[in-house]
């Protein structure tokens, strides 16, 4: 199954920050070995950039970044986060990385309460830090933290300053998730106009549940890179979900994302297991119910042609189709489920089994395929002994 709607041959880069922004979520603390294992899975998945961590923040982060680079640095771009200060940049250089992600906030609230700096001082810091990193031969991505709450004129000035200093990419973070798609589209359109041939990236948080939608809007406005995390993990309400962004770009907009999508479910479960953060049951793409069906009309349609009630095939993302049993079930779904277990009933028997299943479900019981099989065997035996 190809693109569902329009086709666009342009490439969109996938920048995975599961190991940095994702791990910043409270309660997620991966060991160095676990971070390496996740990084290997991400490289296998085919993302373009892996943000391995924040090397200057701790000795553990420094060592993890070094080891990730040594393990997969020949397969994928590995980068590290850095504040716009010389000591952070030096620490990142010491890991052996050839790529760095430098940030400093541009919103007035951050300047006043966190940085205690003037706008002019911030612009000077941007130029000096980006230039310093470039002078050391690094690929530089610059992020104006809290960009979406920044004065627009000043934000554009900060972006231009980073470009003048030699930045290779400009990333626009919606740090506290206050954008909606229409507003973000307008902002990214303006950023793209002042960046020339530089890659514009977006980094969206999910505080209002719009991280994926905003990321897609950013790409539609001209961004050519998206920051994501596996399962959308991250601080507060999380980040844009890798699996949602990848499949939306590929199937709805026809972009080349370069990701082996058949590994999405597997990687999702792997990260969930290591972090201890479960995947929501109704999670798009990788949730247990993402391709689940119970209602009789839906199940009948899916059996005849899965596209009647599925926008993509579960196999494309490594997930599975699940036919559930309950008070909404119909005879077609039951027949398929039983036949998959080697049980073949006539219509009269099927109706009898279905009646008992619905009775159990309406009483609040969960009915499994094993339950259906047991009921079917009971119906068969009743006919034999009759």
Swiss-Prot record:
Gene Ontology terms describing biological process: L-leucine biosynthetic process
Pathway(s) the chain acts in: Amino-acid biosynthesis; L-leucine biosynthesis; L-leucine from 3-methyl-2-oxobutanoate: step 1/4
Knockout consequences: Cells lacking this gene exhibit very retarded growth in MM and the addition of isoleucine does not affect the growth of this mutant, whereas the addition of leucine appears to improve growth in MM.
Cofactor(s) essential for the protein: a divalent metal cation
Chain positions recorded as a divalent metal cation binding sites: 21, 203, 205, 239
EC code: 2.3.3.13
Pfam families: HCS_D2 (PF22617), HMGL-like (PF00682)
Residue runs in coiled coils: none
Protein name in the entry: 2-isopropylmalate synthase
């Amino acid at each position: 199954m190809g693109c569902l709607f329009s086709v666009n041959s342009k490439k969109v880069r996938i920048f995975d920050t599961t190991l940095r922004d994702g791990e910043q979520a409270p309660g997620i603390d991966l060991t160095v070995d676990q971070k390496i294992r996740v990084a290997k899975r991400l490289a296998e998945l085919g993302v373009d950039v892996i943000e391995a961590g924040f090397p200057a923040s701790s000795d553990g982060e420094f060592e993890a970044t070094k080891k990730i680079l040594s393990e997969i640095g020949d397969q994928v771009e590995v980068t590290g986060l850095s504040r716009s200060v010389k000591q952070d940049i030096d620490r990142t250089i010491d890991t052996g990385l050839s790529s760095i992600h430098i940030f400093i906030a541009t919103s007035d609230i951050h300047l006043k309460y966190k940085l205690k700096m003037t706008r002019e001082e911030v612009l000077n810091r941007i130029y000096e830090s980006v230039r310093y990193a470039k002078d050391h031969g690094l690929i530089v991505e610059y992020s104006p933290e809290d960009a979406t709450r920044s004065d627009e004129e000043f934000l554009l000035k900060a972006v231009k300053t980073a470009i003048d200093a030699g930045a290779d990419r400009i990333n626009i973070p919606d740090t506290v998730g206050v954008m909606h798609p229409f507003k973000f589209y307008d902002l990214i359109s303006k950023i793209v106009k002042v960046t020339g041939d530089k890659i514009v990236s977006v980094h969206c948080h999910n505080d209002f549940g719009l991280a994926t939608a905003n990321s897609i809007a950013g790409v539609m406005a001209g961004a050519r890179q998206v920051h994501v995390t596996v399962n959308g993990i991250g601080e507060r309400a999380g980040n844009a979900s890798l699996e949602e962004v990848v499949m939306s770009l590929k199937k709805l907009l026809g972009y080349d994302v370069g990701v082996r999508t058949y590994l999405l479910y597997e990687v999702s479960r792997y990260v969930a297991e290591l972090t201890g953060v479960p995947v929501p049951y109704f999670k798009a793409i990788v949730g247990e119910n993402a391709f689940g069906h119970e209602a009789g009309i839906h199940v009948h349609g899916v059996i005849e042609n899965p596209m009647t009630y599925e926008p993509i095939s579960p196999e494309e993302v490594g997930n599975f189709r699940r036919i559930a049993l309950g008070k909404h079930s119909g005879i077609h779904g039951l027949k398929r489920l039983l036949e998959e277990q080697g049980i073949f009933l006539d219509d009269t028997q099927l109706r009898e089994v279905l009646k008992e299943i619905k009775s159990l479900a309406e009483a609040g019981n969960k009915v499994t395929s094993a339950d259906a099989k047991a009921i079917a065997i009971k119906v068969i035996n009743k006919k034999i002994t009759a």
